[in-house]
From Swiss-Prot:
Family recorded in the similarity comment: Belongs to the FGGY kinase family.
Keywords carried by this UniProt record: ATP-binding, Glycerol metabolism, Kinase, Nucleotide-binding, Transferase
Protein name per the record: Glycerol kinase
Residues engaged in binding ADP: T13, R17, T266, G309, G410, N414
Length: 495
């Protein structure tokens, strides 16, 4: 049967999804399942790895059944995933030794402090491009080894395997035959030298992590193994892997130096491709791995905002100001401005460029005249302000002043937010016709690996822009608003 489709598995923080793309990069069908979040104590976030696998595998089976597409028509499966989230399992039984520790989890802060005390901060920065922060996988691995009974001994005997979620899914899909990751995911572990593209022995020693735990690192665009849907039928190639943000960067075809995208999800993640040069940030950004025009390793600057769409969830779930996230555009548009109100959503600290884990959220500028509409508008504007923080830092680090910003993620359907983003950055904001760019990136990688598409040049004709938002306020007004935001952030950090 002719190979007509590519499937992307998009394993996220709150749900697992499977999406079928045809040769024109149109979405044919989507399947999605949510899974529970586990919060054992304040600042701790976990997932059950078996629930991740169950949700992801069931979406794949359901996707093909619902669409009527036979597995033999699928050219390849690509995988994109929440990054940094850490799983350790028994390599014989496949049973996890502990729940997956999620990227948001802060439990390993003390390990980061210990590494700083050992004088490793600069070495980590130079080698991995990252900061010493519990966000990344390395300290999560060490926490499991040190705190779960018997795990360190088993790891040192070579009985256990570590993986980020991509590695876990490939291992399960191949029935334990393949233990692999790609450079984009490896670069988020705190253990990977982004210059040599190798695991770093000094960092492994510092964290006391056996190298036998670690997966083999293969290119993002490659055939890793084969899988059978529900263990039946012919085999399908697993042929592309990228961490979610690098996958979105590739899906937006930001494959040349100076191109950037911002993903509006639970958090916001802004990445700029810096080509063959690993730019060292002096403004609070991360240096990470990206994917180039020929699927080769490129580098990128990355800024992460912890509270993007999660801020809107807070308005809905904790304050009860809205019933649905889509309501925010209506309420925000009912007022001309926020009447001086700023919301700094530092509920779990502040990410780039501040990196202050002790900052806490604040609602600044409230008066007797402040109402629900002002607060809702301030919440949306906060997402755009934080993205402006990242863009300014990138301009200082790279010397590149962006003229266009590509956007994706759930919140880009909010026209108010997109227009305000253009206004506050003085940059054109381009919204794609297909906003599933994270999944599209994985599909592109898989399709290129097996020859379903010939090159990224062919793909450029498949990424249409649905709307461009043009800056519409004066430079003076923009500066006035942004100065107010900076004052609010300063108060938050001081408090």
């Amino acid at each position: 049967m002719a190979k007509k489709y590519v499937v992307a598995l998009d394993q996220g923080t709150t749900s697992s999804r499977a999406i079928i793309f045809d040769h024109d990069a149109n979405i044919v069908s989507v399947s999605q399942r949510e899974f529970p979040q586990i919060y054992p104590q304040a600042g701790w976030v976990e997932h059950d790895p078996m629930e991740i696998w169950a949700s992801q595998s069931s979406t794949l089976i359901e996707l093909l059944a619902r669409s009527g597409i036979h597995g033999s028509e699928v050219a390849a499966i690509g995988i994109t995933n929440q990054r940094e989230t850490t799983v350790i399992w028994d390599k014989l039984t496949g049973k996890p030794v502990y729940n997956a520790i999620v990227w948001q989890c802060r439990r390993s802060s003390h390990i980061c402090d210990e590494l700083k005390a050992q004088g490793l901060e600069d070495y980590v920065r130079e080698t991995t491009g990252l900061l010493l922060d519990p966000y990344f996988s390395g300290t999560k691995i060490k926490w499991i080894l040190d705190n779960v009974a018997g795990v360190r001994e088993r790891a040192e005997k070579g009985e256990l395997l570590f993986g980020t979620i991509d590695t876990w899914l490939v291992w399960k899909l191949t029935e334990g035959k393949v233990h692999v990751t790609d450079p984009t995911n490896a670069s988020r572990t705190l253990l990977f030298n982004i210059h040599t593209q190798q695991w770093d022995s000094k960092l492994l020693e510092a964290l006391n992590i056996p190298e036998s735990l670690l997966p083999e690192v293969k290119p993002s665009c490659a055939v890793y193994g084969k899988t059978r849907i529900a263990g039946e039928g012919g085999e399908i190639s697993i042929a592309g892997i990228a961490g979610d943000q690098q996958s979105a960067l590739f899906g937006q075809l930001c494959i040349d130096e100076g191109m950037a995208k911002n993903t509006y999800g639970t958090g916001c993640f802004l990445l700029m491709n810096t080509g063959k040069q690993a730019v060292k940030s002096t403004h609070g950004l991360l240096t990470t791995v990206a994917i180039g025009a020929d699927c080769e390793v490129n580098y990128a600057l990355e800024g992460a905002v912890f509270m993007g769409g999660a801020t809107i969830q807070w308005l809905r779930d904790e304050l009860g100001l809205i019933r649905d996230a889509q309501d925010t555009e209506y309420f925000a548009s009912k007022v001309e401005d926020t009447n001086g109100v700023y919301l700094v959503p530092a509920f779990v600290g502040l990410g780039a460029p501040y990196w202050d884990p002790n900052a806490r959220g604040a609602l600044v500028g409230l008066t007797r005249g402040s109402n629900r509409n002002h607060i809702i508008r301030a919440a949306l504007e906060a997402i755009a302000y934080q993205s402006r923080d990242l863009l300014d830092a990138m301009a200082k680090d790279s010397g590149v002043m962006l003229k266009q910003l590509k956007v994706d993620g759930g919140a880009v359907s909010n026209d108010f937010l997109m227009q305000f983003q253009a206004d506050i950055t003085n940059v054109e904001v381009q919204r794609p016709a297909i906003t599933e760019t994270t999944a599209m990136g994985a599909a592109f990688l898989a399709g290129l690996a097996v020859g379903f598409w010939s090159s990224t040049s062919e793909l450029k004709h498949k990424a249409d822009i649905e709307r461009t938002f043009i800056p519409s306020i004066s430079a003076e007004k923009c500066d006035e608003l942004y100065c107010g935001w900076n004052r609010a952030v300063t108060q938050t950090i001081k408090s």
